[in-house]
Amino acid sequence: MKPCQLKQKQKTLAIAKVNNKGKVIQIIGPVLDIVFPDGQLPKVFNAIKINNSNNNWITCEVQQLLGDNKVRAVAMSTTEGLKRGASAIDTGEPISIPVGKETLGRIFNVLGEPIDEKGPVISNDKLPIHRPAPKFTQLETKPSIFETGIKVVDLLAPYRRGGKIGLFGGAGVGKTVLIMELINNVAKAHGGVSVFGGVGERTREGNDLYQEMKESGVINEKDLNLSKVALCYGQMNEPPGARMRVGLTALTMAEYFRDVNKQNVLLFIDNIFRFVQAGSEVSALLGRMPSAVGYQPTLGTEMGALQERITSTLDGSITSIQAVYVPADDLTDPAPATTFAHLDATTVLSRALAAKGIYPAVDPLDSTSTMLQPGIVSDEHYTTARKVKETLQRYKELQDIIAILGLDELSEEDRLIVSRARKIEKFLSQPFFVAEVFTGISGKYVSLSDSIKGFNMILSGEVDNIPEQAFYLVGRIEEAIDKAKQVEKS
């Protein structure tokens, strides 16, 4: 549907439904029962507006039709000030949000309302958050790599264009900086934009991310249209309805950039577990029978409805990076287990690498990708990646021996492996554009071909004479060679 047709339909619906009023008959926390006149029941997922005693409009979403002209809805904000008998207006359509370039550099709530105190968003287009996944005939079926310009990711755990990537890592290991660098690189290298969905995480973290994005230039305060990201927040202090739907709000914004602007989009969801958790809360509030470990019986369906919309089409792509919280480190828990079924790659951040000062602290042995197989990547890429992993794995096995007996007790062959593995480990570090203000080192975007060439030179022994420190925080291999020459001169 064209944007002009969509707007006309929205106006018609708004006029047609303006007299479709119901009455609130029960309020239990964020769940409301509303009765409507005969023949005027709203559809499931329709948005309903209710005016509370403070003259503020509260938006609810219809979840169940109960019979006897009653519906059960879940509020998207707190229900303070609401009372029985309050008038409820059926909008005749799902929650609709502003989309387009006007959303860049702004922060929105689940309803698409700006919450950054920078004034209203004047957008020509609005889209409902509930939309079908692209048809099979519209999908891009040939798998291709989404180049990020980050060596460790592109070489050892490459991302699929239109794929889903799980991001695992504790506090303080560099998740935020990695996310910001990806946002920066997708804008520069692919002419794309990013959408960040903060689902059920801490408000402080959301604020910190926003401030860091402004400092690093990802959000351009002077001209918001030059910003590279739109942000949607439904934080952990908000009702479960908001946390359950804010992921769809972010996804809808991303879909517009893909389908209408025909761009490559990065969609970040932090945290996908909180999406499931919010769905579980809503399910319990609606009185559904719980499933395994107390989760909602519709867990697989809800996750599938979200994930199936994240894909590559013939027009553009949405590549999604999802932070995954694993409750009690139990990978068999239904929430992470359901998420894993949809992932194409995993990026695991290691505290041990961060402690060594190697950033990005991506664990080269724990991170995986379904793209790293012959037939999808080139033979040279596949062989290089396998050899790098083998060398690092052998180094890991030798570390106990080195700690007890020392390096001198190793065979000549093992000493060579250790020397090259240390160079590889250092070379996997990389200066980031968004960290320039902190490190004083200019950021580097490294193409996949340059990454393969560099690691091949280390593996073949061409740079055995260069000290390992020269490989730390450089981009291409040539920079390491130049760095070593400068050290020699000084």
Swiss-Prot record:
It is a peripheral membrane protein. It catalyses: ATP + H2O + 4 H(+)(in) = ADP + phosphate + 5 H(+)(out). InterPro entries: AAA+_ATPase, ATP-synt_VA_C, ATP_synth_F1_bsu, ATPase_a/bsu_AS, ATPase_alpha/beta_chains, ATPase_F1/V1/A1_a/bsu_N, ATPase_F1/V1/A1_a/bsu_N_sf, ATPase_F1/V1/A1_a/bsu_nucl-bd. One of its GO terms (biological process) is proton motive force-driven mitochondrial ATP synthesis. ATP binds at residues 169-176. GO terms for molecular function: ATP binding; ATP hydrolysis activity; proton-transporting ATP synthase activity, rotational mechanism. It is found in: Plastid, Chloroplast thylakoid membrane. It comes from the Eukaryota. Pfam families: ATP-synt_ab, ATP-synt_ab_N, ATP-synt_VA_C. Transmembrane segments: none annotated. Its main location: plastid. Its EC number is 7.1.2.2. Keywords: ATP synthesis, ATP-binding, CF(1), Chloroplast, Hydrogen ion transport, Ion transport, Membrane, Nucleotide-binding, Plastid, Thylakoid, Translocase, Transport. GO terms for cellular component: chloroplast thylakoid membrane; mitochondrion; proton-transporting ATP synthase complex. It is an enzyme of class 7 (translocase). Belongs to the ATPase alpha/beta chains family. Produces ATP from ADP in the presence of a proton gradient across the membrane. The catalytic sites are hosted primarily by the beta subunits. F-type ATPases have 2 components, CF(1) - the catalytic core - and CF(0) - the membrane proton channel. CF(1) has five subunits: alpha(3), beta(3), gamma(1), delta(1), epsilon(1). CF(0) has four main subunits: a(1), b(1), b'(1) and c(9-12). This is ATP synthase subunit beta, chloroplastic. The gene is atpB.
